[in-house]
Amino acid sequence: METSTLHKLKRKAGSLFESQLLQSGRVLEVRHWEPSTMIEIDLHLPQADIQNWHEIPYIKVRVDDLTYRDYTPAGWDAETNTCTLYIDAAHSGPGSKWAKHLQKDDIVRYLKIRSTRHAPASTPAIIGLGDESSMGHMLALQQMVLPATRFSGAIVMADENHRGLFGQYFKSPLMPIERNDVYGHHSLIQWVMEQQYNLEHSVFYLAGNHTMVGELRKLLKLQGYPSSQIRVQGFWS
């Protein structure tokens, strides 16, 4: 009984905390890729200061009671205060469950929007490397790179249909490549080696599952790229 009462008090305190601090947005559209483990969500965020997104941002979204997940918006438009989330729902968890149940006109609540500290370096070649969970991050990076000819990269994707849809949906120099290993780092380093990037003038931006990001960083260093030319952002274990 005592434990149950304490739990109720914590939930009540948490609800008060959330009601004071949370901001809200509205779902404009939800698109489920086939198979529906990739979910594309268009949002209107009237309170977001989108015109000052000079580094790749992340949104700390409320996905359940006192439960939050960080998602990277892409395709943002400061005039309309809109953006799109790309959520990899292939694994179980509160974020995936939340995304799968979203519908048009639902209200989305979020705690804050902050920077990932990823912004394009002033170098001739910006290379983005990621997986399904970092699709939004890679597309956001592409959006920020000017001129666009400086940008290239690859996203490792397990599902063949998703790779085909990516090529259809986006005008992007990002290549969707087949996942031939569990975490994806071996597939990505093989792709990098085939591109023969310039050792001195290439900066890599890595984002995705922690194992892939960590191992890919090691493999790039073995290829001769220094730490100063490798920027990392790990999302999940």
Model-derived segments and their meaning:
Residues 1-237:
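Extended, composition-driven regions rather than compact fold-specific motifs
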